[in-house]
Amino acid sequence: MDAYIGIDVACKKDKYCPISICVKKDGILIPLQLANERAQSPKGLGNIATLSEVNNLAYATAIKKYILAICKSHQLNPVCIAIDSPLQPRAEHLKRRRAELELDKRKISCYTTPSKADFDNIIVKANRHIASGGKANKLPHSMQIFMLAGFAIANALKDVAPCIEIYPHATVKLLDVAGKHKTKDDQAYIQLQALSKFTGWPSTQCEWDQVPYICKGPTHDKVDAYSAAWIASLAQSDRLALGESEASDAIWLPILEHLIVHTVLQKFTPTAEIMPTKRNKKTPSETNIGEHTKLCPACHAHMFKRWPFGWDAHAAHKCTGVDGVNIEARKRIYKERFL
């Protein structure tokens, strides 16, 4: 069976690289439940380690080994790999890549991909920062350094299957669900609902319950990896290249007008409690008891007096917004969604 792979390149130290491996059944793009596998995707080494070509080669090799192992165990044939990263540095004679200029025309923001010479200077500057005692979280050009890992990953995987560059932010812009940052509130689930109309998954409550197991990592990274796999699964005639694909300078988007729109059962209703945002800590004098009262985000019937205290007992026995009779399974599902 053919496999379509999406990689949300991650370099954060000790963070699993989000990788979604999908198959198509009756036109539905179904992700493997990789978080349940014994083997897990490699962890990022951190931005400082990513400055080293040797480290990036090792990371990319580990990702390749992981993908091949999963495909072998499931008897899958990798057909296309979509990577959320530039596949190579910008050409020296360009100020911005052609793909980035196309994004500019569509008013979609993105970081400029440095050229090889630019990266040489970035590495020197970053190493000087470290040598002078600078903190890792203040590393200059931190939002571009991850691209070095992306280059290595693309190079390592090019003999596994054709690799294409995608940009999840551009994808959700096209789907008209980019109004809020993906890490805020329930935005990742809103984006996944929009995707599901074209992938056919998830379409039932049971499938929504499987979302946490697509791969390791935060929900928004899982959704990015799955959306990448979706574009990898499309025929080339159903994809639009922003830039010049012949020059390996293209970001691919779906051509929605070419695609079947699935009728999916939207049983899952996203709520703001699924992905809580960080809030400033308050002193006891600034906090009143009313701020702790909360309507259950699953059943919308039970009122917690001091959220989230008591969630486990409620989820295990009384909550009508969680399916199933197994107590531990009910608590796990509730915790994955709302805590």
Question: Whereabouts are the PLM-identified features?
Answer:
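Short Lys/Arg-rich cationic patches that frequently serve as NLS/NoLS or arginine-rich RNA/DNA-binding motifs
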Residues: 276-287
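Short cysteine-rich clusters marking metal-coordination/redox-active sites
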Residues: 296-299
